[in-house]
Amino acid sequence: MKIRFMMLFGLLTLPVLAWAADALTGDVQRQPLNIQAIVMFLLFVGGTLYITYWASKKTRSRSDYYTAGGNITGFQNGLAIAGDYMSAASFLGISALVYTSGYDGLIYSLGFLVGWPIILFLIAERLRNLGRYTFADVASYRLQQRPIRSLSACGSLVVVALYLIAQMVGAGKLIELLFGLNYHVAVILVGILMVMYVMFGGMLATTWVQIIKAVLLLFGATFMAVMVMKSVGFSFDALFKQAMAVHPKGASIMSPGGLVSDPISALSLGLGLMFGTAGLPHILMRFFTVSDAKEARKSVFYATGFMGYFYFLTFIIGFGAILLVSANPEFKDATGALIGGNNMAAVHLADAVGGDFFLGFISAVAFATILAVVAGLTLAGASAVSHDLYSNVIKKGKATERDELKVSKITVLVLGVVAISLGILFENQNIAFMVGLAFSIAASCNFPIIIISMYWSKLTTRGAMIGGWAGLLTAVILMILGPTIWVKILGHATPIYPYDYPALFSMLVAFIGIWFFSITDRSEAGQQERARFHAQFVRSQTGVGASKGSSH
């Protein structure tokens, strides 16, 4: 293990050496090399690689690899979920949205948060009692294993791929800007670290990377918010009045409605964000890392608290950037635009309130944020291939633990190569729609199957398959025919589907398809699946027979 670790660490130093060489001949558009940021980044990488080495010693079984043996506490898992969910897009994107649009930014952040009560009250407990490693365990509990797991794995992999592309491109652009590092080198560096964390440390290393990132991000955001409030005498009234006085839009930044052009787009976006959260495979997988349903509920309670606090801070940070960044010519280029674009508002604010040292800290935290999210995504993708497709579909449940883990680690390596390749391929593409599409597919395929399989006794395999595939394909087709891809990317004059987000219609297709093709299923298999609901209901409520945490 030590030899393999040293070889991979050697591989890791190649991009760093390239980075050092590149800094001398770098593109003038990039930021100058930030020594504080590099030192903190190297400290973070060193610390997390040590955690990965420690985790690799404790990861002996399939349960250890997928779920950290089920030994994570509710509080730890709450922090890890927050670390998994609070992406760089949340930190930089929402504060940038507040910086440009004011109150609308808060509404957008609520969209990410409002899905969590659904998970707390409807999903967390039953998911933990019925599942073992992936959400497909739950969806296929009383239905036919092979078709349902195939659909769930496809839904998971599509969501993971889209989310991963968005994160990798975002990572490359962000690191290029923050560290003065070449885009391709940045993407390769993120890919190598991601593979190392997941391949060697499994869920235990991924969990602790996410916990450390969440603590660092919450600390950094708190410090920034406190410094912003200190500058206005800790008065929200003064903060908003001064922001309105400085902002080009004036008082209109305090009113909603500027984000979406019509109510259908608003509803579709809201539904995608709300229900998509409850269908994200890397989030659902985290509920199997705790010992029982009680700890799963605690996880959501703590995670919602941490994330609610964080999104509240981004609102203050956004308004702080209006005050302290937009009025400061030091952060503007020759045309009067923000250096690095509006997404850099929070990073410039870190410089304004804490100087070079704190700017370095926030830059390193932004990098940590990306690594934590891509590690979670990679593990979710690998488990969908190894546990759902290989073990239960191809081998029909007869695969050995050793073979399943081997397939999982090979998949991690493949996902790493694919993520790096797609990150480089999509360098100059608009990747914002990919996150929207990932949420829409999660809301249109994964969520309907999970929620209906848990609560509706008349569901059959036929209904789940037809409805699930219909929801997934409708989401993808409507997104392609919509304004983002059909007009902006493919160059057509007008979109066939006029709205940006498909969730409103694709979710409807999924639910109607599942309902109709289940109630019209008169087969013997369908009758048996309905009869098995009672046993599933008892286990989902009591936890009798559910997998427990392993002790080491």
Curated annotation (Swiss-Prot):
UniProt topology in membrane: Multi-pass membrane protein
Transmembrane segments: 5-25, 35-55, 78-98, 105-125, 151-171, 185-205, 208-228, 264-284, 305-325, 357-377, 407-427, 431-451, 466-486, 499-519
PROSITE patterns given in the database record: NA_SOLUT_SYMP_1, NA_SOLUT_SYMP_2, NA_SOLUT_SYMP_3
One GO location term (cellular component): plasma membrane
Signal peptide stretch: none
InterPro entries: Cation/Ac_symporter_ActP (IPR014083), Na/Glc_symporter_sf (IPR038377), Na/solute_symporter (IPR001734), Na/solute_symporter_CS (IPR018212), Sodium:Solute_Symporter (IPR050277)
Subcellular location as annotated: Cell inner membrane
GO molecular function: acetate transmembrane transporter activity; glycolate transmembrane transporter activity; symporter activity
Keywords from the named record: Cell inner membrane, Cell membrane, Ion transport, Membrane, Sodium, Sodium transport, Symport, Transmembrane, Transmembrane helix, Transport
GO terms under biological process: plasma membrane acetate transport; sodium ion transport
Cross-referenced Pfam families: SSF (PF00474)
Source domain of life: Bacteria
NCBIfam families given in the database record: PRK09395.1, PRK12488.1, sss, symport_actP
Its biological purpose: Transports acetate.
HAMAP family, sorted: Acet_symport_ActP
Family: Belongs to the sodium:solute symporter (SSF) (TC 2.A.21) family.
Name the UniProt record assigns to this protein: Cation/acetate symporter ActP
Organism: Pectobacterium carotovorum subsp. carotovorum (strain PC1)
Organism ancestry: Bacteria, Pseudomonadati, Pseudomonadota, Gammaproteobacteria, Enterobacterales
Name of the gene: actP
